[in-house]
């Protein structure tokens, strides 16, 4: 069985058709657009050419193709969505799409919480198979004997970082005056699921999101404290599992447990090993060697990193890392430019939003390989593409 299930194949095929159709229509109609977006498209083209070159010279073509798709396909949804909204304004209903994303994350977060309370049996009752991609695929779904929230997304790390995007969307909707109580309740559910994923970076980012929005909104502070006082005691009384999670979370952030100390030291050792390897082999190991594509290889070439920047360098070399960083940074800059043109923010409020976007990506990339997964990457670039056009009130200022 290939470590590439039918659902993933269908997702990638649909992704290719979506991006290709948008670009073809854009070229045929000869639509004009902003220079940063044009630069982004050229940067993306450079990534494609580099991946093609690496694939041609790779001894394992299938492995290289599996590795290359995360660089070409997942972030490209940003380009397609921005082109649609800028060149064909009526083609997308941003409010409905954002509400759908929030609702979807609320549903999977609820499922993940119930699953944790049922000790990992709930998603199995829903038909989830943790070996959907073969026995060789090792999933991160437990820690120190405790089930980690995954929501059926296979990996607790990717799941936790994905939900931080939901928290950010909820807080942005709240700041724009859109269904404030509902958004706050949903964000709390998402935060509980993030905590149950036991993903330190995601918990840190979610706390940072709340802190920055609360600082600029007293209503949010009052509502948040009220909900916290009501919800947390009810959950704590209903089950003692929260006591175990609280103890583990404290251990995760203080390194007071043996497992946590091993995790922290392991990351340091992996970073040193990656730097040593790249200093001797700046061209890296090869495309597809760090992800699931490595399972197709006779020889295990993976060098564990838990860092997406090292991941890119090990797969595409130092040059590939530079090209990818330029491409990803160009998309981020394009979003900030579009926010200044189309956004609902005034003053310096958009800096808060993009600081949080940058924090989500940097922390997830520095502490994991989450940006290489479709679970996190597609949602991240989708939200980054849509957020400049999100106007939920007639006010031009975020308060």
Swiss-Prot record:
<feature type="transmembrane region" description="Helical">
    <location>
        <begin position="309"/>
        <end position="329"/>
    </location>
</feature>
<keyword id="KW-0808">Transferase</keyword>
<feature type="transmembrane region" description="Helical">
    <location>
        <begin position="185"/>
        <end position="205"/>
    </location>
</feature>
<feature type="transmembrane region" description="Helical">
    <location>
        <begin position="37"/>
        <end position="57"/>
    </location>
</feature>
<feature type="transmembrane region" description="Helical">
    <location>
        <begin position="374"/>
        <end position="394"/>
    </location>
</feature>
<comment type="pathway">
    <text>Bacterial outer membrane biogenesis; LPS O-antigen biosynthesis.</text>
</comment>
<dbReference type="InterPro" id="IPR051533">
    <property type="entry name" value="WaaL-like"/>
</dbReference>
<dbReference type="GO" id="GO:0016740">
    <property type="term" value="F:transferase activity"/>
</dbReference>
<feature type="transmembrane region" description="Helical">
    <location>
        <begin position="97"/>
        <end position="117"/>
    </location>
</feature>
<keyword id="KW-0472">Membrane</keyword>
<keyword id="KW-1133">Transmembrane helix</keyword>
<dbReference type="GO" id="GO:0005886">
    <property type="term" value="C:plasma membrane"/>
</dbReference>
<feature type="transmembrane region" description="Helical">
    <location>
        <begin position="353"/>
        <end position="373"/>
    </location>
</feature>
<dbReference type="GO" id="GO:0009103">
    <property type="term" value="P:lipopolysaccharide biosynthetic process"/>
</dbReference>
<feature type="transmembrane region" description="Helical">
    <location>
        <begin position="151"/>
        <end position="171"/>
    </location>
</feature>
<keyword id="KW-0448">Lipopolysaccharide biosynthesis</keyword>
<dbReference type="Pfam" id="PF04932">
    <property type="entry name" value="Wzy_C"/>
</dbReference>
<feature type="transmembrane region" description="Helical">
    <location>
        <begin position="4"/>
        <end position="24"/>
    </location>
</feature>
<protein>
    <recommendedName>
        <fullName>O-antigen polymerase</fullName>
        <ecNumber>2.4.99.27</ecNumber>
    </recommendedName>
</protein>
<keyword id="KW-0997">Cell inner membrane</keyword>
<dbReference type="InterPro" id="IPR007016">
    <property type="entry name" value="O-antigen_ligase-rel_domated"/>
</dbReference>
<comment type="function">
    <text>Polymerase involved in the biosynthesis of the lipopolysaccharide (LPS). Catalyzes the polymerization of the O-antigen repeat units on the periplasmic face of the inner membrane, leading to the formation of the lipid-linked O-antigen molecule.</text>
</comment>
<keyword id="KW-1003">Cell membrane</keyword>
<feature type="transmembrane region" description="Helical">
    <location>
        <begin position="222"/>
        <end position="242"/>
    </location>
</feature>
<keyword id="KW-0812">Transmembrane</keyword>
<feature type="transmembrane region" description="Helical">
    <location>
        <begin position="64"/>
        <end position="84"/>
    </location>
</feature>
């Amino acid at each position: 069985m290939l470590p590439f299930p039918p659902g993933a194949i269908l997702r990638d095929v649909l992704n290719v058709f979506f991006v290709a159709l948008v670009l073809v229509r854009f070229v045929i109609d000869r639509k004009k657009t902003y220079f940063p977006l044009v630069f982004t498209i050229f940067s993306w083209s450079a990534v494609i050419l580099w991946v093609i070159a690496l694939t041609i010279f790779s001894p394992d073509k299938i492995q290289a193709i599996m590795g290359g798709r995360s660089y070409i396909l997942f972030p490209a949804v940003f380009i397609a969505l921005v082109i649609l909204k800028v060149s064909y304004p009526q083609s997308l209903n941003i409010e409905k799409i954002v509400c759908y994303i929030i609702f979807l994350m609320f549903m999977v977060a609820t499922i993940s919480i119930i699953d944790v309370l049922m000790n990992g049996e709930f998603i199995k009752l829903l038909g989830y198979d943790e070996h959907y991609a073969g026995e060789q695929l090792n999933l991160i779904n437990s820690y120190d004997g405790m089930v980690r929230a995954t929501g059926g997304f296979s990996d607790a790390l990717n799941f936790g970082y994905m939900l931080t995007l939901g928290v950010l969307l909820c807080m942005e909707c709240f700041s724009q005056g859109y269904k404030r109580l509902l958004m706050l309740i949903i964000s709390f559910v998402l935060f509980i699921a993030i905590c149950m994923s036991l993903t330190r970076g995601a918990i840190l980012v979610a706390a940072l999101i709340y802190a920055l929005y609360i600082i600029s909104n007293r209503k949010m502070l009052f509502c948040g404290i009220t909900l916290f006082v009501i919800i947390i005691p009810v959950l704590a009384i209903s089950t003692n599992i929260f006591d175990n999670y609280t103890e583990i979370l404290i251990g995760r952030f203080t390194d007071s447990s043996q497992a946590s100390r091993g995790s922290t030291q392991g990351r340091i050792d992996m970073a040193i090993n990656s730097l040593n390897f790249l200093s001797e082999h700046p061209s890296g190991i090869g495309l597809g060697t760090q992800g699931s594509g490595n399972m197709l290889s006779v020889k295990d070439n993976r060098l564990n990193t838990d860092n997406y920047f090292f991941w890119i360098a090990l797969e595409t070399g130092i040059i590939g890392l530079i090209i990818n960083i330029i491409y990803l940074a160009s998309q981020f800059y394009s979003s900030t430019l579009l926010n200044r043109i189309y956004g609902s923010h005034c003053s310096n409020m958009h800096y808060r939003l993009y600081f949080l976007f940058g924090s989500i990506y940097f922390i997830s990339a520095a502490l994991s390989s989450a940006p290489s997964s479709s679970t996190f990457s597609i949602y991240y670039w989708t939200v980054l593409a849509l957020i400049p056009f999100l106007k939920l009130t007639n006010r031009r200022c975020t308060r």
